[in-house]
Amino acid sequence: MRFKGLDLNLLVALDALTTERNLTAAARSINLSQPAMSAAIGRLRDYFRDELFTMNGRELRLTPRAEGLASAVRETLLQVQCSIISWEPFNPSKSDRCFRIVLSDFMMLIYFNKIIERVAREAPAVSFELLPLDSDPYEMLSRGDVDFLIVPEFFLSGAHPSAKLFTEKFVCVACSTNVDLPSALTIEQYVSTGHVAAAFGRFLKPSVEGWFLLENGIQRRVEVVVQGFSLIPPVLRGTNRIANLPLRLVEHYESTFPLRIINLPLPLPVFTEAVQWPALHNADPGSIWFREILVEEASRMMSSNAPKIHGLLQQSGS
């Protein structure tokens, strides 16, 4: 099938090549043989009158022309998929759809497990692929590689629709066996005490509280950096270090790790967790159904599971 001289099948090949950046992987992703994919590259070069790709070992490097085409081609294919191919009534009880979702370990532990339980009852054949926060989840969102991104509202992209889920606050914690640490710290004590901090992605981007401290000119003595909040309690145990954690995660680990809340002379940030989805999925019935579940469960959690900070403060001797 040709449109203005372009074989439309070549757009699928071009999308695979710009996504995978590897000839073999691109061919495999669309069930083509490697010789057939090589032939497709030749035809693409002829049509666009550009080299499009150069080889660097096994990696395909995109020319500026190919870089410019990549997002336009992906958006076009997504529009076809969402508006034509996938447009049909969504029946949760019969659907076998797999939702790909990027979220933090914190959200998995204190929130998303409830989503999984509910979906198992209402849509038993629906499945999930849960992905960690990468260095650039927004590119995955724009390309339609993921269905949802669940992050603090602070980190949302302005290019896609979103919905608020719930608010959360950070608290400073220490191991309860650290008897030398007072129940309240001065700002000098806070910045000079060794910290365990969470970071995300290949480039170890700081979390919300990390950005908050940086923007307010507060330089901590970070001694240990871990990938995600859930690794902080076991690393903190038995040490003289402190850390900042979401309050609900502290409560989640209350019976597992000896944690106590430390009072600080500065307020740590309150933040809002939110969900974002590709703009092209905005009218997708399956996406709408799942978004409603996310918001409903967040509302239910907020009303029935208010943080129990007072008990943890009493453990700290305040």
Swiss-Prot record:
* Pfam families per UniProt: HTH_1, LysR_substrate
Q: Which UniProt keywords apply?
A: Activator, DNA-binding, Nodulation, Plasmid, Repressor, Transcription, Transcription regulation
Q: Which InterPro entries match?
A: LysR-type_TF, LysR_subst-bd, NodD_PBP2, Tscrpt_reg_HTH_LysR, WH-like_DNA-bd_sf, WH_DNA-bd_sf
Q: Which PROSITE patterns match?
A: HTH_LYSR
All residue ranges annotated as the HTH lysR-type domain in the record: 6-63
Q: What GO molecular functions are on record for this protein? A: DNA binding; DNA-binding transcription factor activity
Q: Could you confirm whether the keyword Transmembrane helix appears in this record? A: no
Q: Per its UniProt record, what Gene3D superfamilies does this chain match?
A: Periplasmic binding protein-like II (3.40.190.10), Winged helix-like DNA-binding domain superfamily/Winged helix DNA-binding domain (1.10.10.10)
The UniProt function text for this chain reads: NodD regulates the expression of the nodABCFE genes which encode other nodulation proteins. NodD is also a negative regulator of its own expression. Binds flavonoids as inducers.
Tell me the protein family, please.
Belongs to the LysR transcriptional regulatory family.
Q: What is this protein called?
A: Nodulation protein D 2
Name the gene for this chain: nodD2
